[in-house]
A protein has these predicted regions:
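Solvent-exposed alpha-helices and their adjacent loops that cap or buttress functional pockets
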Residues: 10-12, 38-40, 105-107
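Beta-strand secondary-structure signal
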Residues: 46-48, 66, 81, 112-116
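Short beta-strand segments
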Residues: 15-49, 67
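Short, structured beta-strand-loop surface elements
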Residues: 17, 54-99
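Short, surface-exposed beta-strand-loop junctions and turns on beta-sheet-rich folds
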Residues: 37-38, 53-54, 86, 130
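C-terminal edge-of-domain segments
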Residues: 83-88, 92-159
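Short, basic/aromatic recognition patches
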Residues: 1-17
Length: 159
């Protein structure tokens, strides 16, 4: 069995938006959303370099990366720690490019980042620590998002 379990795979495939944290050359953090985040295999994630110059530059200097993927309604997700490799040519790059084209990604893809996941952990909202059920959390955040669609404001509290 790999590092990425079936539930983690499901979350990544459903959400597709991951947040990648890398380290800048001056040792400051860089956090960047990656709308092409996908599970490549049981031990790897992948995302496309569409507009990621800082992320790619950082990984070329320091391959340390963490990717977080969270369902904004259930407030559950996954944290993946590992190393990222930037691929701009070769068989794996070609396979990843074909993968994204099949998914309908039409943007220019300059490279892909293959993340070797060394550690994968679940993420959950503190609301669960207080005894909230997933249904309660989902209902609370569905109401919030519905209010936003209607032009209302006011986020749920306690999370």
């Amino acid at each position: 069995m790999g590092t990425i379990d079936e539930d983690m795979r499901r979350v990544v495939e459903e959400q597709r938006l991951g947040y990648a944290a890398t380290v800048c050359p001056d040792a400051t953090p860089n956090l960047s959303p990656k709308g092409t985040t996908a599970v490549w295999d049981d031990n790897h994630l992948v995302f496309a370099d569409i507009r990621s110059p800082r992320t790619v530059e950082n990984l070329r200097h320091n391959p340390a990366i963490e990717v977080n993927v969270v369902d904004p309604i259930s407030r559950k997700g996954c944290r993946f720690k590992g190393t990222g490799t930037v691929l701009a040519e070769g068989t794996l790059f070609d396979e990843a490019l074909a993968f994204y084209r099949r998914r309908g990604v039409a943007n220019e893809i300059r490279a892909v980042v293959l993340v070797q996941v060394g550690r994968a952990m679940p993420l959950t909202s503190p609301a669960y620590d207080l005894g909230a059920t997933e249904q309660e959390v989902r209902e609370r955040w569905e109401r919030h998002h519905e209010a936003l669609r209607k032009g209302e404001s006011g986020a749920p509290t306690g999370e």
